[in-house]
Design a protein with these regions (language model features):
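Mature N-terminal, pre-catalytic/accessory segment of carbohydrate-active enzymes
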Residues: 1-152, 282, 299, 551-701
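Short, Lys/Arg-enriched charge-dense amphipathic segments
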Residues: 15-36, 103-114, 153-154, 169-179, ...
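Generic detector of short, locally flexible boundary/turn motifs and exposed helical patches
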Residues: 18-24, 62-65, 110-113, 192-194, ...
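Hydrophobic transmembrane alpha-helix bundles
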Residues: 32-45, 113-137, 182-195, 264-275, ...
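Feature activates predominantly on carbohydrate-active enzymes
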Residues: 35-253, 270-271, 372, 406, ...
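A generic structural signal for ordered alpha-helices
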Residues: 44-50, 109-112, 116, 187-198, ...
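C-terminal non-catalytic alpha-helical accessory regions
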Residues: 83, 129, 183, 414-663, ...
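Catalytic-core regions of glycoside hydrolase
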Residues: 101, 121, 144, 156-167, ...
């Protein structure tokens, strides 16, 4: 970027995009130089001379200069340019990313393809208009990493000289309806019946596909965004059966094919910054020459080494996930990797909207060095429908992340849906909104605060005021924050670690892999999130009946917090609704808040009913049972209100790949069944100490 100067009568904006330009500009204006020369840093300086005011952006690099320019553009838009003060800015978190499961093609699926969102977004993945808007939104919110996840993307990305028939022309989608019977490890994501009925979404030879992704990466590079592909292993969709390639771990032909494909990926995409790999979820835990880590090194590591022999100056980052492997085996197998080698940890497992300080990384921290730092996978498998927004929670979550000597960065996103265009609205825009655009406030909070957690709430308030001038911004912001407290409150109380075990929008888990709808008995017997300081119902009952101190937040306190947030949301909404006028986005945003408030009231009443039943289980007193029934009847009414509010804005039924079909109004009979469960409850059926449940293990030594 060259130095840019914009005049506006008695006002001038000047932007410098490297240290030399910044020093020269600071000297010319007689202002202090930029303090940080680190990547993405910038300073804003205000100078006045001879009646002319100059706002200068001193960038340490092009990205820093862009961020400074965005600050000035924002100040112009919000009407605060005259008060924009001189200040220095550097990122708190160096790399701030999005995790995006990419449904490339029915023949090269992502981990999320057996769901409505993935199927509807296949064509969008091959639209440059989509990626231009998506990446531009990322940059505005200060994200600088785009991680693209797919089980086996190579046939849709490269043409390998040794395996030319593997490369796939055109983009195809199956005409067979998806369902909830697929494996949760991806090993049957391509089925013969799916391949028997394909339609061509877009005519596109492999050469055009390569040109397309080069253009996407070039646009990302121009916006300061690094791009990475991530894979799971061993999947050979699109290549299976060709040249003797199979998914068998001891098949040397498969290893050779992967090695050549990785080499070509590096060589084909000069702007690709690296690759991320997984030692699963389709690998055997072998201890021979075909062990997980030896296989990965021979397939991926040697492929990268081969590419670097041809391009010795090429930098290429390797990110190895902890998932389904051990630290010792990883570090031993990859000790000779010739470039940056980092790890990746599922930070809050599947639920970022839980507590601001997830404890799961603590056992791993001592083994993480500054030479091999970890990335955080920050999974959002809590909220698929609604517009979330609570700066207090986001700021606390970010501040609790490990320091830079341990953490390379993070990428956030879901496995259970796809952050492409939304396809659930009952009154969609044309074309349909990108999820990142629909949920702009949430993405703004996480992106801007991860760059600078000291940003004041006043910035977000001014932004809301500009976007929704019909309503008082402080009131709108408070209602949004209160509604957004529902998801963390309930998820820390009723914990299901991985995505298929807990989807709080629907009180649901996968119907076969877990329990389906969680009943009031499940709540009585449920566990709370480790490290949350919240007591489960059985822990609370034990303390209450023994007369010992409550060593934590009680279930009734959780219920009260949910009720309080929901009541405050609905109180504020009454006035906001009266002012919404014809602003469609405002109306829909308030509708999301209303839905979240009714959901919070539902969970509060259900927890109270579960507490009553836990006492009845010990006392046998009918008064406890009747109190439970009353609370569960209230829960039913709140669910009905939730269903009405939800279906005003969203299709009532969607298929998600991790929990199956979610039908909010269709679940009313299941909610009613809780009342019947209470009526027929037999005392003495809940032990004081419950069996330990299966738990995800994100770290192994």
């Amino acid at each position: 970027m060259d130095r840019v100067v914009l005049d506006r009568s008695a006002f001038k904006i000047a932007i410098a995009s490297d240290p030399a330009q910044s020093t020269a500009l600071a000297t010319a204006l007689g202002v202090a130089p930029i303090k940080s020369d680190g990547p993405q840093s910038y300073a804003i300086r205000r100078a006045t001379a001879n009646g002319m005011t100059t706002l200068a952006v001193l960038g340490s690099d092009a990205t820093g200069a862009m961020y400074g320019g965005l600050d000035i553009a924002e100040a112009i838009r919000l009407g605060s340019l005259d008060t924009l003060a001189s200040a220095d800015h550097a990122p708190r978190i160096e790399r701030r990313g999005i995790k995006f499961n990419v449904p490339l093609d029915a023949r090269t699926p992502s981990y999320s393809d057996n769901g409505d969102a993935a199927q509807n977004n296949i064509a969008e993945m091959w639209s440059f208009d989509f990626w231009r808007e998506f990446i531009d939104e990322m940059a505005r919110h200060r994200y600088n990493v785009l991680s693209l996840w797919n089980l086996h993307p190579f046939p849709s990305l490269v043409k390998v000289p040794e395996y030319p028939e593997v490369a796939l022309d055109d983009v195809k989608r199956t005409l067979v309806p998806m369902d909830d019977t697929f494996s949760h490890s991806g090993n049957d994501m391509v089925r013969p019946d799916l391949l028997a009925k394909l339609e061509t979404v877009k005519k596109m030879p492999i050469a055009d596909k390569i040109a397309f992704w080069r253009d996407v990466m070039r646009h990302a590079h121009n916006r300061g965004v690094e791009v990475y592909w991530f894979t799971w292993n061993i999947f050979t969709w699109g290549a299976e059966g060709k040249y003797g390639i199979t998914s068998q771990q001891d098949n040397q032909k498969t290893i050779d094919y992967f090695r050549a494909s990785v080499r070509e990926l590096v060589l084909t995409y000069p702007l690709l910054d690296g690759i991320g790999i997984t030692a699963g979820e389709h690998m055997e835990d072998r201890k021979d020459q075909f062990s997980k880590e030896k296989w990965l090194w021979n397939a991926y590591g040697r492929g990268i080494v081969d590419a670097r022999k041809l391009e010795p100056d090429r930098r290429f980052r390797m990110i190895h996930r902890y998932h389904q492997s051990s630290t010792e085996e990883i570090m031993d197998a990859w000790k000779d990797y010739p470039d940056t080698f980092e790890l990746s940890f599922k930070y809050a497992i599947a639920h970022m909207y839980s507590i601001p300080n997830p404890p799961f990384i603590q056992p791993a921290l001592p083994s993480i060095s500054k030479d091999h730092r970890t990335w955080l996978t920050v999974r959002d498998d809590d909220i698929y429908s609604f517009r979330w927004g609570n700066p207090e929670f986001a700021r606390a979550f970010i501040r609790n992340m490990p320091d830079r000597d341990k953490m390379a960065g993070f990428y956030m996103g879901p496995d259970g849906t796809v952050w492409g265009r939304e396809f659930i609205s009952t009154e969609p825009e044309r074309p349909r909104d990108l999820v990142i655009s629909k949920r702009w406030y949430s993405f703004m909070l996480w992106g801007r605060l991860s760059y600078d957690p000291e940003l004041p709430d006043s910035l977000f308030e001014r932004t809301i005021a500009k976007r929704f001038p019909e309503v008082p911004a402080p009131q709108m912001m408070r209602a949004w924050a209160e509604a957004s407290k529902v998801f963390p409150q309930i998820t820390r109380f009723f914990w299901g670690d991985i995505d298929l075990r807990w989807f709080p929008e629907a009180c649901l888990s996968h119907p076969r892999a877990a329990k389906g709808f969680y009943t009031v008995r499940d709540f009585v017997e449920g566990a709370t999130m480790p490290g949350s300081g919240v007591l489960s119902i059985t822990e609370w009952r034990r303390s209450k009946l023994s007369g010992t101190a409550m060593n934590g937040v009680t279930p009734l306190e959780v219920a009260e917090a949910l009720s309080k947030s929901s009541a405050e949301t609905l109180r504020l909404l009454a006035d906001l609704r009266a002012r919404q006028a014809a602003n469609k986005e405002l109306r829909l945003t308030l509708g999301d808040m209303e839905s979240m408030a009714y959901l919070g009231n539902y969970y509060a009443a259900k927890i109270r009913g579960a507490v009553d039943l836990a006492l009845f289980d010990k006392s046998g007193q009918d008064a406890d049972r009747q109190s439970a029934i009353k609370n569960l009847q209230a829960a039913l009414e709140y669910w009905k209100r939730y269903a009405r509010a939800y279906t005003v804005q969203y299709k009532p039924s969607q298929l998600y790949n991790r929990v199956g079909v979610v039908d909010i109004p269709g679940m009313i009979p299941k909610v009613e069944e809780d009342i019947a469960i209470a009526r027929r409850w037999t005392p003495g059926t809940v032990p004081d100490t419950l069996k330990e449940r299966p738990a995800d293990k994100p770290f192994q030594k």
